[in-house]
Regions:
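Conserved phosphate/anionic-ligand binding catalytic regions in large, soluble enzymes, centered on
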Residues: 1, 191-208
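Catalytic alpha/beta active-site cores
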Residues: 1-139, 144-145, 163, 171-178, ...
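Helical (often loop-to-helix) elements that flank the catalytic cores of nucleotide-handling enzymes
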Residues: 109-112, 153-158
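Extended amphipathic alpha-helical segments enriched in small hydrophobics
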Residues: 146-152
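Flexible, glycine/threonine-enriched loop-and-boundary segments that flank and lead into catalytic domains
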Residues: 157, 180-191
Length: 208
């Protein structure tokens, strides 16, 4: 085997393959890990129900995927991961598959409440997991898109407050919007920029 240059102990070659617990004292690593988990931000989009309904890229069964989603959420609870969304409940793909704005909203909220019921059935507390849920809607040219976010937030807040007895944070529906790819046309390509701009304006006026 080739010999390393003088003064090189090989550590630099190994760093990419090492985890923190291999280079730090155990107590230091655990402290840093716990702090990082409470601060890390991001989103998991693993919404199995929209896969079944719209995107059709399922690898595992719905039952197995639900269990996996529940395991992720339970890990977040156990490790006090509060700022990382365990699932992005997605209406965008449902809309791109052909749903109108009202149907998109209905399916997406129904999926969200399905996850709520499943997590509750596993013994999780509503206020421990509801803040880890986020939503993802499509926008289009239909006038209903100008209020889709406000309607979703109102329905979610009422359900969280009156049915599930969730606290103020659980009642907040967090979502983002992407403009619709389905609304763009090759036949009128010069107008696509205008369509996308109007859709973005809808989202802004809807307090996205």
């Amino acid at each position: 085997p080739e010999r390393l240059p003088h003064g090189n102990n090989g550590l630099g070659l190994k760093l990419l393959g090492l985890s923190g617990d291999e280079v730090l004292p155990a107590d230091v690593y655990q402290k840093l890990k716990a702090e990082a988990l409470t601060q890390v931000r991001g989103t998991v989009q693993a919404d199995i129900l929209k896969e079944d309904q719209a995107q059709n890229t399922c690898i595992f069964s719905t039952e197995f995927a639900l269990k996996l989603m529940g395991d992720v959420q339970q890990y977040f609870i156990d490790q006090k991961v509060r700022n990382f969304y365990s699932v992005s409940i997605s209406g965008y793909h449902i809309a791109e598959a052909g749903a109108n704005p009202i149907t998109q909203l209905a399916f997406t909220l129904a999926n969200g409440f399905t996850y709520v019921e499943y997590y509750l059935s596993r013994g999780m507390n509503i206020d421990d997991f509801a803040p880890n849920l986020s939503f993802f809607f499509s926008n289009g040219m239909d006038p209903e898109y100008s209020v889709i976010g406000r309607v979703a937030r109102r329905i979610w807040a009422k359900a969280m407050k009156h049915k599930y007895r969730g606290n103020d944070r659980s009642q907040k529906l967090k979502y983002h919007i992407q403009t619709s790819g389905r609304s763009l046309h090759a036949q009128e390509i010069d107008f696509n920029d205008i369509r996308t701009t109007l859709q973005a304006l809808y989202a802004i006026y809807d307090n996205c």
